[in-house]
């Protein structure tokens, strides 16, 4: 699926309400599908993406009658609850942002291991997997 992000000149207030004219006119994505089998899901979920000179805006319409969220700690494992997730592909990296119904944020930046080479653009101390605070995806030291 391809979705086009549309430029907006209207001011958008970040308040969780998608009632500005820009959102009302923005084309919504097709209905989301099951991540495992690609089939239809029980409840409708769609998104729209807008941008201006400063921000990228992503709005979700989620038809979920039984929303559950308990985690309030930033970067807690909110993907175990109801949340929305955004992945931005950077080629050999990706940025992930998740937000649950309590506005708890899970944010991470991944660099594929094959992209990390000595002398390459990611050969910086912050990304050294042998540093004390560097963790692999599973949370264990490499």
How should these model regions be labeled?
Residues 1-142:
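Structural preference for beta-rich elements and adjacent junctions enriched in aromatics
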